[in-house]
Structure formats: structure tokens, C-alpha cells
A protein has these predicted regions:
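Helix-to-loop junction immediately C-terminal to a conserved catalytic motif
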Residues: 50
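The feature captures the beta-strand-to-loop junction immediately N-terminal to the Walker
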Residues: 35-37
């Protein structure tokens, strides 16, 4: 187990800057998820911690020691990749043993046997030990790949989108298994992904990375409920937050089509008349009347009638897309009732749950 800290990391590849002034602190034993779109710098960050890349500027600390000049082997970290990195001609047992053999670790045979048995038992792959890996399913191969990391007993587990090549059902199962494994081992995990469902369901903490910068870190609940800017609001959450540009005028939020809403009191000290803002509301906080519960003050509850553009039935709920100010707003409707495109539906929402962002900077104005 280990404490990881990155200080003011900048990484350049020729004229391209992959990371800019990145700071990251991962306590010992934490499951930390780095979430970002393709090209955000997630894998570059992982490779610098692993010792496969050196920062252009800044420092990498493991347990308080600057390891910038240490090789990957000296850092004692384990890397699990999207591609399984297994030897197809070897059995599962031989693949698990390989990192421990004389040329690598020089462990006694008894110790190797014990570590392999423990890893196989933990990952429930004991029945596969004598099978060659080219005869395994994708999920089984990924378990073996994780097992190769476990047998080493590394200080840190680094995981680069290990579930992205699996089908949806298997990804869901392995999300739970990986989280349980991390708690069982008590190890430090850094898991990178572009999938916000993986991030929110697995991480003790999540860091959102955008164009080489960490824009927000916090628990999944903190990031979902209090996004720091419009990027986080639109990226985290499925469906994402409804965002609509507006102008502040005479104590109201006025939209371009002429509709207006009262400006919530907590924002009044943060904006002036004429300010351009972005109004935000989660689909969970926008209900067809009679299909949701509002926990706030009744004075904050408002209703608007909107035309339905499309619906997405999901069984126990339906996503309703309805046009507001020339954009589709999304509502999550529980206890679904039949709705069709063109229907007009009364929508209810609680302004105490609304978000407001600066249109100029994208930063949250929420208290």
C-alpha cells in the first residue's frame, strides 16, 4: 500500500502539452478514479506514476519519496491494461507464476505456489489454472490479468480502462468484483476510465480530467451534486445535466425565448442585472407532475408545460425529452405512463435544486 502525490506535473510531447500543472493526492488504501474523455491525459498520468514516462516539470511522490528518477521496477507498482497482456501458450497458472519466477523476483517455489493459490482463490479462477489463456473468455482473461498484478503484492495498482473491452453485463459484474477486491486487499488503486458510470460506482474519490487539467476532485456524490463547472455538470451524470443559457434581469432568470424563473435567493449576491448565466437542472430534479417528490419549500416548486419530443422507456422509468427554449430538456419519469412525441406535459421542479454557472467562465455560482 502507498500514498501517491503528484505536484505541479506538466508533460509535453514536442509541441503538444498533455498535462498542465496537475496536482493529485491519493491517500494510502484509497480507490481513486481518474475520469476523462479520450485525450484528456488519463493514460499519460498513469504512465508517469508507473515510471514509463518522465514529467517535463513537477514531481511524483510515492510514500513521500520523490521517485521521478526511479525506474518502473523500482517503484513496485502493478499495471493492468485494457489489453490483457497474457502469454497465450501458457496456462493460467504459468501466467500467474511468471512475474515471480527467478529472472523476475527470485522467490522460492513454495512462496510462488502460495501466492498463485491465494490470487486464484480471491478471483475465483481456481478451476481455470491448468487451462491455456487462449481458451478463456474476455472476463476470465481480465481476471487472470488482475491476478498477475495481485501475486506481485505491489505498493500500488494502476488500472488503465481494464473493463472497456468487455460487454455491458460483464463490465457490471467486474465493477463489483474490483471494488470488493480493493477493499479486501486494502490496497491503493488508481483506476482511469472515460466511463462515468464506472467512476461513480467504484471510486472512493473521483478526479475529473479535462484537457490535461484536474477540474474537480471529490466523492462521487460531491461531484454529482455540486459540479464545479459546466464541463463537470455535462460530463458526469447519465443523462447529463440540463443546461440552458439565460440572462439575469430584475431578480429573474430570463431565457432567450422570453420564459423566466425567479432567481433563487442564494444566487442574488453573486450576480448582477445583465449578467449572462447558464441555468442547470438534473434530470432527476425535473418531473412530470405527479411523478416525483419535492423535499424543499413549496414556494420553490415551479411548473411549466412543455411539448414532448421523444421518450426512451427503460422499464421502471422513462426518459422524457421535452422542448424548452429551443432545446431538449430531459426528465427521469418514475412509474412511467404512456407519452408520445407531440404530447404536452406539465413538468415540475424545485428551484432549490437548480444550479447556476457563469456563462463567461463556466464556473459554478452555487453557494
Amino acid at each position: 500500500m502507498a500514498h501517491i502525490e503528484l505536484k505541479n506535473i506538466t508533460k509535453k510531447f514536442g509541441g503538444h502539452t498533455a498535462l498542465t500543472g496537475l496536482n493529485l493526492n491519493i491517500p494510502d488504501g484509497e480507490f481513486f478514479v481518474l475520469l476523462g474523455e479520450t485525450g484528456a491525459g488519463k493514460t499519460t498520468t498513469l504512465r508517469m506514476i508507473a515510471g514509463l514516462e518522465k514529467p517535463t516539470e513537477g514531481q511524483v511522490f510515492i510514500d513521500g519519496v520523490d521517485v521521478a528518477d526511479w525506474s518502473a521496477a523500482e517503484r513496485d507498482v502493478a499495471l493492468v491494461l485494457q489489453q490483457y497482456s497474457l502469454y497465450p501458450r501458457y496456462t493460467v497458472r504459468q501466467n500467474l507464476e511468471f512475474p515471480l519466477r527467478p529472472k523476475i523476483r527470485r522467490l522460492p517455489d513454495a512462496e510462488i505456489k502460495d501466492r498463485v493459490a491465494r490470487a486464484a482463490r480471491t478471483l475465483r479462477i481456481e478451476h481455470l489454472l491448468d487451462r491455456k489463456t487462449d481458451r478463456l473468455s474476455g472476463g476470465e482473461m481480465q481476471r487472470v490479468s488482475i491476478g498477475r498484478a495481485i501475486v506481485r503484492k505491489p505498493r500500488v495498482f494502476l488500472m488503465d480502462e481494464p473493463l472497456s473491452a468487455l460487454d455491458a453485463k460483464l463490465r457490471e459484474a467486474l465493477r463489483t468484483e474490483l471494488k470488493n477486491l480493493q477493499m479486501q486487499l486494502g490496497a491503493t488503486f488508481l483506476f482511469v476510465t472515460h466511463d462515468q458510470i464506472e467512476a461513480m460506482s467504484m471510486g472512493d474519490k473521483v478526479g475529473v480530467l479535462n484537457h490535461g487539467r484536474i477540474v474537480q476532485t471529490g466523492t462521487p456524490q460531491e461531484i454529482y451534486n455540486n459540479p464545479r463547472d459546466t464541463y463537470v455538470a455535462s460530463f458526469v451524470g447519465s443523462p447529463p445535466m440540463n443546461l440552458q443559457e439565460a440572462t439575469v434581469d430584475d431578480g429573474k432568470i430570463v431565457f432567450s425565448g422570453g420564459q423566466s424563473l425567479p432567481l433563487p435567493g442564494r444566487f442574488k449576491a453573486k450576480v448582477n442585472a445583465g449578467d449572462k448565466v447558464v441555468f442547470g437542472l438534473r434530470p432527476d430534479d425535473l418531473y412530470p407532475v405527479g411523478h416525483g417528490l419535492h423535499s424543499g419549500d413549496a414556494a420553490d416548486v415551479h411548473e411549466i408545460e412543455l411539448p414532448v419530443t421523444v421518450t426512451e422507456p427503460l422499464g421502471n422509468e422513462t426518459l422524457v425529452f421535452a422542448e424548452f427554449d429551443r432545446r431538449d430538456w430531459v426528465s427521469r419519469m418514475l412509474n412511467p405512463r404512456p407519452l408520445r412525441a407531440g404530447d404536452r406535459v406539465a413538468m415540475s421542479f424545485d428551484l432549490s435544486q437548480a444550479h447556476l454557472f457563469s456563462a463567461e467562465t463556466g464556473k459554478s455560482l452555487r453557494a
